[in-house]
């Protein structure tokens, strides 16, 4: 896979064009001042796009990934992409984001591990950032994305769309920069992190840090990584991503194959969760998991803005808000609050799904309708 590096100039304009469709571009945005005042130097953001950029650059749709996603929204696995697109089929000719008309752009979020600057990246001293990587927020992620777009000569977007952490990013974008976006889709998220979410995320972080191979966060390059802690964190997280009824319908209390839980064997659901944990641990950096989990726990669109209600009511942008009926991580009451307080929302769209929080990824036909409606709003 070709990787094109793009470096911001003092004028903020692009020195090279967007990468070829589906290819990764590395955009160097320079130093970024974070919300807590820390200056993160030499920041790089990985970018992919699908569809052609219009001459007036007015057809950009930002697709924002969740916790363990990346810039690879759609397409097969391959070099640089250990898995197929995480929202495969959402962008392309005739797709909800119709690339015959729109230019879909996705980044790997700040703090990520698929080309963007994160804990596994090299700091200016040539050593991995590791434990020295600063705490970041959702607001910082949006600032980095916008800086990457500015480096490519894009200062406004037609729409931002995302679910879960991507939904938090979309919401921050809409509230912080309402003059630079025409519409938004906010899925399966709330206005701020809840106590339950913070508890869930901090427990996952604790599992990773309890692994002796965490090494205080400085395990990169040592030949050892906190894989076991990462797997446990993912097993716990996956339970919050799926619907309770769906899991019971699939597994109930059935033993795994020929194993007997009464003599030390596993239940089928244990095997399933172990598989999910191992799958993520093979492709995702534990340090990034910690940094992004902490960013999610910091999510609060009302911080510094007079609270959630004041922040949401200040946003005039047309917004589609969607929630999943069986979501137990971001229950539908959280999206109801968004729908009631955002002036540009015409009411909550409910996706009836058994798949829990992951419904925003699984129910592509239903979610696709929400994407199409969002882009209709962007054309008004």
Swiss-Prot record:
Domain of life according to the entry: Bacteria
Annotated localization: Cytoplasm
Family annotation (Pfam families): Abhydrolase_1
GO cellular component: cytoplasm
Gene3D superfamilies on file: alpha/beta hydrolase (3.40.50.1820)
Pathway: Amino-acid biosynthesis; L-methionine biosynthesis via de novo pathway; O-acetyl-L-homoserine from L-homoserine: step 1/1
Domain AB hydrolase-1: 59-363
Active site, per annotation: 164, 327, 357
Catalytic activity: L-homoserine + acetyl-CoA = O-acetyl-L-homoserine + CoA
Molecular function GO labels: homoserine O-acetyltransferase activity
Major subcellular location class: cytoplasm
Binding positions (substrate): 234, 358
InterPro entries noted in UniProt: AB_hydrolase_1, AB_hydrolase_fold, HAT_MetX-like
EC category name: transferase
Keyword annotations from UniProtKB, A to Z: Acyltransferase, Amino-acid biosynthesis, Cytoplasm, Methionine biosynthesis, Transferase
One example of a Gene Ontology biological process annotation: methionine biosynthetic process
Known EC number: 2.3.1.31
PANTHER family in the cross-refs: HOMOSERINE O-ACETYLTRANSFERASE (PTHR32268:SF11)
Function field: Transfers an acetyl group from acetyl-CoA to L-homoserine, forming acetyl-L-homoserine.
Record text on subunit structure and interactions: Homodimer.
Family: Belongs to the AB hydrolase superfamily. MetX family.
Protein name: Homoserine O-acetyltransferase
């Amino acid at each position: 896979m070709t990787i094109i590096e793009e470096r911001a100039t003092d004028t903020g304009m692009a020195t090279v064009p967007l990468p070829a469709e589906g290819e990764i571009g590395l955009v160097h945005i320079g130093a970024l001042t974070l919300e807590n005042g820390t200056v993160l130097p030499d920041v790089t953001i990985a970018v992919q796009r699908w569809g052609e950029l219009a001459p007036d650059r007015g057809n950009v749709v930002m697709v924002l990934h969740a916790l363990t996603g990346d810039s690879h929204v759609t397409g097969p696995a391959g070099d640089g992409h250990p898995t197929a697109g995480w929202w495969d089929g959402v962008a392309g000719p005739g797709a909800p984001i119709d690339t015959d008309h729109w230019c879909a752009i996705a980044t790997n979020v700040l703090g990520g591990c698929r080309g963007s600057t994160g804990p596994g990246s090299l700091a200016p001293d040539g050593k991995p950032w590791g434990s020295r990587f600063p705490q970041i927020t959702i607001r910082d992620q949006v600032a980095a994305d916008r800086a990457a777009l500015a480096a490519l000569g894009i200062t406004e977007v037609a729409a931002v769309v995302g679910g879960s952490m991507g939904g938090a990013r979309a919401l921050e974008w809409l509230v912080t920069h309402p003059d630079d976006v025409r519409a938004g889709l906010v899925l399966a998220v709330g206005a701020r992190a809840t106590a339950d979410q913070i508890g869930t995320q901090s427990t996952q972080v604790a599992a990773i840090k309890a692994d002796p191979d965490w090494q205080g966060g400085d395990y990169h390059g040592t030949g050892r990584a906190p894989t076991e802690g990462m797997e446990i964190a993912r097993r716990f997280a996956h339970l919050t991503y799926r619907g309770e009824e769906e899991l019971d319908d699939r597994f109930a209390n059935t033993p795994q194959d020929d194993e007997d839980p009464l003599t030390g064997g596993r239940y089928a659901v244990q095997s399933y969760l172990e598989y999910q944990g191992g799958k993520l641990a093979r492709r995702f950096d534990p340090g990034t998991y910690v940094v992004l989990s902490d960013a999610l726990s910091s999510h609060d669109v009302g911080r510094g803005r007079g609270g959630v209600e004041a922040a949401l009511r200040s946003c005039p942008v047309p917004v589609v808000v969607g929630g999943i009926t069986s979501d137990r991580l971001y229950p539908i009451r959280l999206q109801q609050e968004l729908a009631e307080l955002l002036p540009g929302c015409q009411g909550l769209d409910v996706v009836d799904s058994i798949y829990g929080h992951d419904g925003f990824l699984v129910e592509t036909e239903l979610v696709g309708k929400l994407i199409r409606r969002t882009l209709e709003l962007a054309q008004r």
